[in-house]
Design a protein with these regions (language model features):
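N-terminal secretory signal peptides that target proteins for export/translocation
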Residues: 1-10
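Acidic, small-residue rich beta-repeat scaffolds with periodic aromatic anchors
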Residues: 27-63, 160-163, 167-225
Length: 225
């Protein structure tokens, strides 16, 4: 074999090795970050993990491991004292659990509690359960968790208080506002929306998602919580 042929062959081998190292070795391309939702857990698996009434569970897997989001609701009434009316309270609670493998116990990572109190008026509060979800909108392998809720303390036709929370890892975005009230024969009222300033710098996919959730809930909850 000539000297030039040896040089060409050696150069080709070097390029092949460099390509294999770039692609993660002989096994091909490096594994991509994955996200997927999982089937619901049994009541026995969830025993002792939440207070009150369980409304929804979201089970998923992402680059941080197995995740379990539990949504619950509890009610209590403080008795009337002297000249004060009884005080009703509904507490909305979301809690994220993680575990390293199937044999490990679930460990709480964060809790978000929203106690709503109402004295002498009608109290209503709950989640928009079809807007409670885990997603991977920006395809980075880390789940975004969406919570959307409503509350009302009043005695007439008034707007509900609306809240959207979007959490991804340590980052949290929030939108608050009022439901749009439409009564036949009258001008609509309510419908105000206030965005967390940090939302403006979020990824476009996340901002679009929040807008979509707001459109879905902006008229409030028509029935029981």
């Amino acid at each position: 074999m000539s000297t030039d042929a040896r040089r060409i062959r050696r150069r080709g081998q070097c390029l092949l090795i460099a390509f294999m190292l770039t692609m993660g070795g002989c096994g091909g391309s490096a594994p991509k970050a994955t996200f997927e939702t999982s089937p619901a857990l049994s009541d026995a698996d969830l025993k002792g993990l939440y207070p009150g009434t369980l409304l929804r569970q979201v089970v998923f897997e992402d680059i941080d491991g197995a995740g379990l989001l539990l949504i619950s609701r509890s009610e209590q009434t403080s008795p009337a004292r002297e000249d004060k009316e009884p005080l009703d309270q509904i507490t909305l609670r979301a809690e994220l659990f993680r575990r390293s493998d199937l044999a490990a116990p679930w460990t709480s990572r964060w809790i978000q509690e929203d106690p709503i109190q109402c004295e002498g008026l009608d109290l209503e509060a709950g989640y928009f359960l079809d807007q409670v979800m885990a997603t991977d909108l920006d395809n980075d392998g880390r789940a975004e968790l969406t919570l959307a809720s409503h509350s009302f303390c009043g005695g007439g036709v008034d707007p509900q208080q609306l809240r959207i929370g979007l959490r991804q890892g340590e980052q949290y975005y929030e939108v608050r506002g009022e439901s749009l009230v439409e009564v036949e024969g009258d001008e609509p009222f309510g419908g105000d929306r206030q965005d967390d300033p940090a939302l403006a710098s979020a990824a476009p996919a996340l901002r679009a998602h929040v807008d979509k959730v707001w459109e879905a809930i902006k008229r409030g909850q028509p029935g029981p919580p």
